Amino acid sequence: MKFLKKLGPVRTVRMAQVWGMGLSATLPALVSTGAWAQASATAEEGQTLAPVVVTGNPLGGNELIAPTEQVGGAELRQRSQSTLGETLNGLPGVSSTYFGPNASRPVIRGLDGDRIAVLNNGAANTDLSSLSYDHAMTMDPLLIERVEVLRGPGVLEYGGSAVGGVVNVIDGRIQREALFDDQGGITGKVDAGYATGNKEQSGAVVLDGGTNRYNLHVDAMSRRTDDVSVPKDLSCTKGGVTTTSRTLCNSASDTQSGAIAGSVFFDRGYLGASLSTYESNYGTVAEDEVTIKMRSNKLALEGELRDLQGPFQSVKAQYGQTDYQHTEFEAGVAGTVFNTRGQDLRVQARQVRWGQLDGVMGLQFDDSDFSAVGTEAYAPSSKTLQRAAYAHEEYATTWGKLSAGARVESVKVDSYGVAGVARFVPGSRSFTPTSYALGSLWNVATEWQMTANLSANERAPKHYELYANGEHVATNVEEIGNANLDLERSVNVDWGLAWKRGAHNARVQLFQHQFSNYISLEGTDLSATPPQYTYTQVQARFVGFEASGNARLLQGHDTVDWNWRADQVQADNTSTGQPLPRIAPYRVGSTLRWGRGAWNTRVGVDYYGAQNRVPDGQLATGGYTLWSAGMSLTSKLGGYSALWYARLDNATDTLAYSASSILTQTVPGKVPLPGRSLKVGLQLQF
C-alpha cells in the first residue's frame, strides 16, 4: 500500500494536464515518423477484422463454451449511453439497475452487484458502484473500444462470486501487439455528439502512435448533460422553491476522463503501463438536491513473456492500483465522504500443450480499504484481503472440446468501526470459498453447435453485508448487516444450442441458478421509519432463457436483415415462496436493418412485459413498448474516415418505469425512464 502514498498527488490532475502530458509525450515521436498513410490503413483494417473474444478465453480459441456477446465499433457508437448499464441494457439476458441516467450497472440473468464481475482490460475495476445503486461506475462508454459480456458462472479466472457473468470493458490503452511497422505511424479517432433529450454535449479524442517497438497512447473525453426529459410533468424542489416540468429533477451531470499510456514490445513479449483519471459531478435523482462529486485515479501495469522453456509457454501479469473518493452534497453542502483504495495483482501462466490438453493456471491478490465518514455513513471502515489460485483446462476432441476449472480463495474481512459511532462494532471474519466448473462444446452437425456448463460456486460475504448498520438513503431503508453470514453457495446449469448458415443465425440458452443460502436483504421491521432490513441467508432459485437470431431477408445491392431477441428470468425466495425483488420482466424485441454501400438504417421495437411477480408489499410494474430508430453513413471527410450516426430513442415518448430499478419501489412515480431523444454524432478516424 506504500505506493498509494506516491499516487496521492495524482488526485489533483485535471483534464488540461491529461491532455498536455499525453500530447507532449506522444506528438514528437509521431511527427518524426511521417507515416500517416500507414496509420490510416491500420485504422481501417481494424474496423473490418472481428477481434477474438479475450474474456474467459485464456487459450485464444475462436469457439467459446460460455455464452458470449461482443459490442464494439459502429454498433457500440450507435447504442452508447452515458452509463455502461444502459449501454448494454437490452442485450439478451442483460438489464440494468437504472438509478437515473447517471448511475446504472449491468444486471445479468437477474443477478447484480458483486455477483457480476466488471473488469477493465481483464483486470479488476475498483469503485463503489456495487455498494449502492446511486454510485456511478468509473468508466465512460465514449472511451470504450469494445465490451465483452459473458453470461453464466463458469469463468473462474475472475472469481467464484461472478455467478451471473462477467462484463469486460476494453479500452486499448495498453497495447499488447504492435500497431505499426518499423517505419512508425499514428492512428486515432475524434468523436463528437449531441442529444436532445438531456442536451448532452460530448466529445472524445483517442491517439496511438509509435513503431513496431513501442506504442504511446493518449485519450480524453468530456460529457455534459442537463436534466433529462421525461413523458410526464414532475415536480422539483430546490432552495425551497417547487417547480413543475417534463424533466427529471436533479439528473444533470458533468464528466471528464483521460489517460496516458505506453507499451514496449520485444521479441518475446511486451510491457505496458497506463495512468488514468475519471471525474464526475452528477445528480442522484432520488432526492432533489443531493449530488455526488466523484474522482478516481488508476495506475495499471501489464506484461507478458512468451516462448518460454520448461512446463510453461508464457507468463502474463497484471497489476492495478486505484484511489477512489466521492463526496455526497446536499444543497451544495458537503456531507458523507466515501473512500476506497485498492490494489490487485494477477499472474497467469499458460502451460505447454500436452497432446490435446491445453490450459492455464494463475494466482490473484486483491487488497482494498473502505471508509465512509459523515451522517449518512451506514457501513464502517473496513479492509478486505483476498488471495486466490485457479486453473482452467481444455481438452480438444474430434467433435468439440471439454473444459474444467477450479478456484480456491482465502478472504478476510475486517471491520474497524468508526470512532465515536457506537453502532459500528469492530469485527473480523475469514472465509475459504472454493468453486468448480465443467463445460462442453459439441459440433453436433453441420451448422449446429451445442454447449453445456455446470458449476458449483461459493461467494464470501462483502463487508457491508457483514457490518452495515444505519440508514441507507439511496434505498430508503435501514440496512443491518449480519456478522454471522456463511458462504453463499450455488449450483448452476447452462445449456445452449446455436445454428449458423451464412448471414442467418439463431441461438437459445437455458439456465438455472440454485442457491442454498443466498444473501438477501430481508424486511425485519417494515413498520419502522425508515423500514428496517437485515442481510439474511435464504434458499433461492433463478431460472430463465435467452434467445436471439438474425435472418437475411434480402441479399444483393441492398441487404435487409431481421434481428430478433427475447429473454426471461424468474427468481424466487424458495424459503418463503415469495418472488425476489427487482427482476426484469420478460422482453421481446425485433429490429429491421437495411444497408446499401455506406448507408445503414434500422428500426426497432422492444416490448417489456408487466412485472407482477414482486414480493408482498412491493409495487408491480406495468408493461410498455419502446420504439427506436437509427442511421449511419461512412464516408471520407478531409481525407479521414468519417462515421455519421443518428439514433432516436423512445420514439413515441412512452411513459415507462424500470422493474429492475430500486427507485420504482422507494420513490414510486418519481423516476420514469427517459422520454424521446435524438442523438447525432460524428466520429473521424485516421
PLM features per residue range, with description:
Residues 231, 458, 514-516, 633-686:
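C-terminal beta-signal and adjacent terminal beta-strands/loops
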Residues 175-176, 184-191, 195-294:
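Periplasmic-side early beta-strands and strand-to-turn transitions of outer-membrane beta-barrels
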Residues 43, 357-359, 398-402, 505-507, ...:
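Gram-negative outer-membrane beta-barrel transporters
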